[in-house]
Amino acid sequence: MPFLKTLFRGALCSIACGASLFCAADVYRIIRNYPELMPVSYMDEKGSPTGFETELIRKIAEQAQLDLKEEFVANFGDTLTALENGKADLAMATISVTPARQQIFDFTTPYFRVNPFAFITKDDSIKTIQDLANKKVSVWTGSNHEQKIKEIQKEGTGSVIPAKSIFLAVKAVIQGEADVAVGDDAYMLNFADRYKQHNLKAVIDRSTEPESYAIAVRKGDQALKKKIDDALLQLKRDGTIDALTKKWYPNRT
């Protein structure tokens, strides 16, 4: 994906440095999901990345004066692996903060709350995560959902079908290979509208605890964490985050 990588380097360098020809000495490598998660991050009609996280990271870069070089990966697991292995300095990729992940990474102040179990299905019997015990469930490989579904299915007859992207997880439902695709409500609900000709419906399990998205940085990198936290605090105070949330999630309560 060299085109996207080059495009975002130029865009974020300009944001961080303004009209100056000189950029900051510190260049931070950020890894993100490939833009196919409308409205979180996706390609617009001109072929340029856009969406909630795309606009937010640009605002953060501007506020914190960070020079960021972006790279996109399709597999969620590759996002965290790259950060853990030192191939990136930070990751912004619909990453929920969990105790297990906090053992490996440091996290910034959360910027978005999500319902972690949203389903795309044709099956009217699926209402909550407990209904997946005996179902064929398609999940994004490396996501937080994969392990949780496996735990639910320990006493059942269901199975997990790994998918390299959330689009492929939904495609498995469309093609009848899976009963349901599972993900966060931040990006799953849109699929029911986009592919309504396939009689898909979106269901949110509101019995589960909400989770929070945050930016992950390498363990111990308190300097970068503070820069981002300070930027997020200012963007919260001046209403930028609320404005972006209303823009991309107008029906969210």
From Swiss-Prot:
A Pfam family it matches: SBP_bac_3
CDD domains in the record: PBP2_HisK
Signal peptide boundaries:
1-23
Question: Can the keyword Transmembrane be found in this entry's annotation?
Answer: no
Location(s) in or outside the cell: Periplasm
Give the record's GO biological process terms: amino acid transport
Instruction: Report one GO cellular component.
Output: periplasmic space
Molecular function (GO) terms for this protein are: ligand-gated monoatomic ion channel activity
Question: Keyword set for this entry?
Answer: Amino-acid transport, Periplasm, Signal, Transport
The record's comment on protein family reads: Belongs to the bacterial solute-binding protein 3 family.
UniProt cross-references to PANTHER family, sorted A to Z: L-CYSTINE-BINDING PROTEIN TCYJ, MEMBRANE-BOUND LYTIC MUREIN TRANSGLYCOSYLASE F
Q: Write down what this protein is called.
A: Amino-acid-binding protein AabA
